[in-house]
Amino acid sequence: MSKPKTVTVNKLLTRYAQGERNFSDISLVAAIFNEVTLNRINLSGANLSEALMVHTRLIGANLSRSQLSYADLSMAVLIDANLTGATMTETVLHQADLSGASLSGAILSQVNLTGVNLTGAGLIGTCLLNGSQLTDAILVGATLTRSVLSGAHMTGANLNRSILSEIDLSGANLTGATLIRVHLNQGNLSGANLTGADLSESVIQNSNFCIANLTGANLTGANLTGANLNGANLTGANLTGANLTGANLNGLTLQSADLRLANLSKADLRGANLTGANLAGANLLEADLRLANLTDANLCGAGLLLTSLRGANLAGANLNQANLIGASLSVANLDHTTMEGTILPNGATHQ
């Protein structure tokens, strides 16, 4: 393996000013490049460990395979930069502009990306390890397919319209994050904190939300078909119009959740806590609600055809205008349940 070429900062800047752009595989350890313009420079494979590049302009720069560990790129402009396969340990990228940049295959460990702009960036297969900071980061339209962000701090991050297929966000903190219209197919969000997060109109098919905290989350119109929500907390979540066909909601806490017009056909809701939940107009065709707690729940106009409610607690529930044809209500608690105009399991209408 060839020895990295060493060059002084002044010499590099002089050669750059003369029109040279290729500085691949050079060594610039602890170099100081603050507030310098190096647009379109080729620093692929360069060693920039501990370099100071605060406010540096690196638009369209090639930093692929570069070593940027312990470097400070705070407020640097890296628009459309190539950081494919770069290594960054404890790198500071606070409020840097990485919009349109490619970080595919890059490894970032304990990196500070607070307030960074990653709009439209490509992070396919990128690894952000050991609790990297992405607080208030902007990732609008970014591609994070198969990225590893387990345990990442992403409070208040904006991921609207981003592609997150097969992403690993297990244990990540996404409190208050916005994920409107994201594609999150087959993602791993087990143990993630999504308290107050906005996932409205998102496609989240076959994703794992096991023991995730979705308290107060906005999931209106979201497609959660086949999602695993086992052990998740959805207290106060808004699931109006959400598609939860075949979803695993076994034993879930959905207390006071808004599930109006939601599609819960064939969903597993065994033992779920739906106390005070709003299920008005919801589709619960062939859903399994055995032993579920539906105390004071609103099921007005809900479709409960062929639904299993064996042993469920429906005390004080509103079943007005609901359709219960073929439903199983054996051993269910119907104390103080209102059933005005309800179609009973045998097809008769309750008066």
What are these regions (language model features)?
Residues 2-351:
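Tandem repeat scaffolds
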